[in-house]
Amino acid sequence: MSIFPQMRYFSCIFLLLFTLTICERVKSGNQLLTPLPQDPLIQVYFNNSESSEYRETYRQKTRLGDDLETQIVDTIAQAKSTVDIAVQELRLPKIAQILAQKQKEGVKIRLILESNYSRPWSSFTSAEIAKLGKREQERYQDFQKFVDINQDHQITSEEISQLDALLIVKNAQIPLIDDTADGSKGSNLMHHKFVVVDHRFVIITSANFTLSDTSGDFTNPSSLGNNNNLLKIDSPELATLLTQEFNIMWGDGVGGKQDSKFGLQKPPRQPKTITLGNSKITVHFSPISPTQPWNLSSNGLIDQTLSTSTKTVDLALFVFSDQQLANTLENLHDQEVQIRALIEPQFAYRPYSEALDMMGFSLSDNCKYEVDNRPWKNPISTVGVPILPQGDLLHHKFAVIDHQTVITGSHNWSEAANHGNDEILIVIENPTIANHFQREFNRLYSKIKTGLPANIQSKIDAEVKQCPQIQKPSSSTISTPTKINLNIATQAELETLPGVGKKLAQKIIIARQQQKFTSLEDVGKIPGISDKTLAKWEGIIIW
């Protein structure tokens, strides 16, 4: 695909100027693995694949991997009528540029973002930047260095207008909403990462549209990007399912009624299964209310899929904190299914991490184990964390089952994803697809640290010494009120109500602090609570 003139011009600037500064030119000496066959209707890509290489646009270095940004750009570039994108964060200029170009050509573009990431970096004031957390301030500093094309430490409006992705989107007047479009302060997390083009072509990925999730942190030469996967699927039937999810969130769009639905405001739907060529595909959208049966949730679908295993289960997960899934894996292990697991290091050893269970350990938090915690009686030694370049993360959310079936998408294996976030989970039964994910798992598993780190063992020992008795809470003994008093309920209790996430629960608490509720009319005055929501609460709330 030919990039339009503006992008060619700035690519040249990158090529000429960055060579003299922080750019790292690396001659291709990579030993590539033989590429695996791709399914004609479902292509699989990994940003750290060892069977391909590409030259980065921004840092101008040749490296191993698939260029995920280019895959997204090329898919959008073929659009003739429509492009719908729902993604947590969009910071990649080439994607913004192609969206602007396609809109000029008359293609209908719609974009949904997470409200925490829906502003151009360049729009932040000094006071706002000062209030950002450490990680976000570091990201802002990376952005400043990224847009300073000539590296003169003087950022111009021209530089910003070409490289601040959301400013490009804004200047192109591309229709954009976020999860505050329902009148709330935002849902739990709009965590989707999908694209639908011309009601036919679909991208589903674990990657946000950022440098760190695709090619790597701009100012860190050793960074190769958080490890992610991307699926390109040619299926009008699948595109229809994703468009339905998109339309629920979109409502009537920009500046219209506050009829968008996010999080638990969305109607619950059952998983949908389609046949596409040689593949059987099942799709489910999160979240689901914790008052609904767990087996109907996305984690429930994961559980059902894991339970089919008779040979092997390999996991590569950013977060793993769902106890019931760990219990299912233990049952499979007891049936001699071989299980291997890789967990992102920053989450692998938290008190809620199921990696600890799989290794046979428990770590309490303030003298209390997680609810229903169950360390394995026959622990395994095939649980570990990958050794990655400094700053890079294991951002995958996939499992490979019996070399036949793949579970992937944006959905982390956690309660937050299951009961709070807007997510997509996709299960694909096709050995050709599974082979790609198996190769990716094997690559990551070839460089790992297994076992319990000494500092975590010290934490466990310290908790045992400091706590007279460590509580072992059980869901069977935790009382759940049949009716919830809105004037005294805890935030956790409020979040069990249909349609209530963290942010709405907080708004209820703030409202009652100002004036106690005495009627449904009082409750209905809270932004984000509709008549339909109140109808769902009938018989389960009091004041």
Describe each model-derived feature in a short phrase.
Residues 83-87, 177-178, 312-317, 341-342:
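Short catalytic-loop micro-motif centered on adjacent basic/acidic residues
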Residues 87-94, 318-324:
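Acidic-and-aromatic substrate-binding clefts and catalytic sites of carbohydrate-active enzymes
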